[in-house]
Design a protein with these regions (language model features):
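Extreme N-terminal basic, low-complexity initiation segments
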Residues: 1-9, 15
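Nucleotidyltransferase catalytic core that binds NTPs
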Residues: 39-283, 291, 295, 318, ...
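Catalytic, metal-anchored helix/loop core of enzyme active sites in primary metabolism
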Residues: 288
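Short, basic/aromatic-enriched C-terminal tail that caps enzymatic domains
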Residues: 298-299, 308-336
Length: 336
């Protein structure tokens, strides 16, 4: 028997109104900034509980000549997500965000059940950074003809899904590609924004966009806490001691970048540096690998590298974390 997940509504949609002191608005392109002129006006984030209403809202924006930026998420928003939204706000007339905990990309039902959810808190954060619309839905609303996840034929995610995360989480990238296609068709964005923290996923999504002919995929740098730990929705599941222990992932990656800048180029030697740092941190390493970011391969590289992406997955207690770092450039946001 395949995976079976009960389909149910997981969020309630309250529509709080936020009073603002406004007069007329000042046009900044097709985006409008309020001015402070003394009259009371109400501005709210549009919250839509299903993909069909979201589709109509986005179609109206495009019909009015507005560019639509899109940030797909599974909720439990943190500074990494908000950085994507801010980038989208800066580059588009309107921005929408999806919040959908996608059962298709979970191998373990317990992991799905454990995934943090707080729609109202997420919506409040989105409103503060200038998002115009947020929507969600159930699996059955996205796939009306099915009642459980294992009835859905998932999309082939392509060769970039092979190895590493694809090997550790069979079916994960098929689930990602399948829901991203649905979300793209709902929103019809000109640009969609993803974080480099999920590096292999970004390759899969770029391939999907090439096959669909849209949207432009904008991959933004990983955002880190002051400790160097990459922001992740799963970080809230860590104890204080585990949170400190988890910093060994980023420490290993930045040690590797220093080795690269000091002239080390051999793939095997670089991987040895990374493994040494991770073993010193005491985490349970699932993989610690290098890949050419421009030419994905299932096999680990050997010999000298011209450019390199270091990728790691490890368990800290019961929490599985991933991280990665481009070695031949310096553009992560946060502590190094």
């Amino acid at each position: 028997m395949g995976k079976q997940f009960l389909i149910k509504d997981e969020v309630s949609f309250n529509q709080p109104q936020r009073p603002m002191i406004l007069g007329t608005s000042v046009s900044t392109g097709n985006r409008h900034a309020p001015t402070h002129c003394g009259s009371l006006f109400t501005m709210t984030l549009v919250r839509l509980p299903d993909p069909e209403r979201a589709r109509r809202w986005c179609a109206e924006q495009r019909a009015d000549g507005r560019s639509v930026g899109f940030v797909p998420t599974m909720g439990a928003l943190h500074e990494g997500h908000l950085a994507l939204v801010r980038r989208a706000v800066a580059e588009n007339d309107v921005v929408c965000v999806s919040i959908f905990v996608n059962p298709l990309q979970f191998n373990d039902p317990k992991d799905l059940a454990r995934y943090p959810r707080d729609f109202d808190a997420d919506a409040a954060q989105l409103e503060r950074v200038g998002c115009e619309m947020v929507f969600s839905g159930t699996l059955q609303q996205f796939f009306p003809k099915v009642k459980q996840a294992d009835q859905i034929v998932t999309r082939d995610p392509g060769p970039c899904a092979e190895g590493l995360e694809g090997a550790s989480r069979p079916g994960h990238f098929g689930g990602v590609a399948t829901i991203c296609e649905r979300l793209f068709r709902v929103v019809g964005p000109g640009r969609a924004y993803f974080g480099e923290k999920d590096f292999q996923q970004s390759l899969v999504v770029k391939q999907l966009a090439r096959e669909l002919g849209f949207p432009e995929i904008v991959v933004c740098p990983t955002v880190r806490e002051p400790s160097g730990l990459a922001y992740s929705s799963r970080n809230v599941l860590l104890t204080d001691a585990e949170r400190q222990q988890a910093t060994c992932l980023s420490k290993a990656l930045f040690a590797l970048r220093r080795a690269w800048h000091n002239g080390k180029r051999d793939a095997i030697e670089l991987r040895t540096v990374m493994l040494h740092e991770l073993e010193h941190g005491g985490v349970q390493v699932e993989y610690a690998e290098l890949r050419d970011p421009h030419a994905w391969t299932v096999e680990s590289p050997t010999g000298p590298m011209l450019r390199a992406q270091a990728l790691v997955a490890a368990r800290v207690g019961k929490v599985r974390l991933i991280d990665n770092l481009r070695l031949d450039r310096d553009d992560d946001v946060g502590a190094q």
